Amino acid sequence: MTAPIQSKMATRVAIITGVVFVIAGLPKFIGFGWEVANFTRFGLPVPEAWVIAAGVIEIGGGALLIARRWVRFSCLVLALTMAVAIVVSGLGRGDIIPSLTLAPALLIACVYLGTNPPMQR
């Protein structure tokens, strides 16, 4: 792929991935009690702290991807978050949706963006 095409593709992937992360992070605060119940079911200690951390990471990281700022750092943190989601809730508890569908797709998008970051605005 040529550089301009690659950059346009990376820009689109960054924006779309960022929007998905922001949307995924909002329920951590809007439906806090429901999310805490899920995180409790996953066997995580201090589930309230995990819910808040996940929400901040998803919304903050998603916003940085949309703005195309600190893309590699954001993708590293977001990829680690998705890896935890896959292992803890997907493989650990058998939650197919979203932990074994959306989380792996977002992990792949983060790896792509981490190795092919879009140009900053």
What are these regions (language model features)?
Residues 1-30, 50-56, 60-121:
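Extended, low-polarity transmembrane helix blocks
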Residues 32-45:
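Membrane-interface interhelical connector segments
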